Amino acid sequence: MMQDGMWHVETFESKVEPGVLEAFFKDELLPYWRSRGFNVKVFVTQYSLGPAQFWLLTEIENMASFDSWPELAEGEPRGRDLMNRVVRMMENVRGSVVRDLETTGHGR
């Protein structure tokens, strides 16, 4: 875990049949991203009103970390293909950066 406890969080819903997006993340996208240096996790609601909601969390060192993301995530043909595929399966995407309140130096 990085010292600052910062995470980029995206929440979204699936546009595809139940289980398809989950399998894509587990079998293809998460292993690829991790091989490229990302510390990334995906959570999905188990019980909720309405469609299942996904939470994609990616640990970041600082705000400048975003500068290297395009090359890490899409710098290879396989990465571009995976990103194009996942974007087509997602809807209602929202993103933010959060920080662990228990780390030193938290705040705005």
Identify the meaning behind each predicted range.
Residues 9-11:
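Short glycine-rich or small-residue beta-strand-to-loop segments that form or flank ligand, phosphate
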Residues 18, 61-64, 103:
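A short, structured loop/turn motif at beta-sheet edges
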Residues 23-41, 59-96:
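An amphipathic, aromatic/His-enriched active-site/gating alpha helix that lines ligand/cofactor pockets
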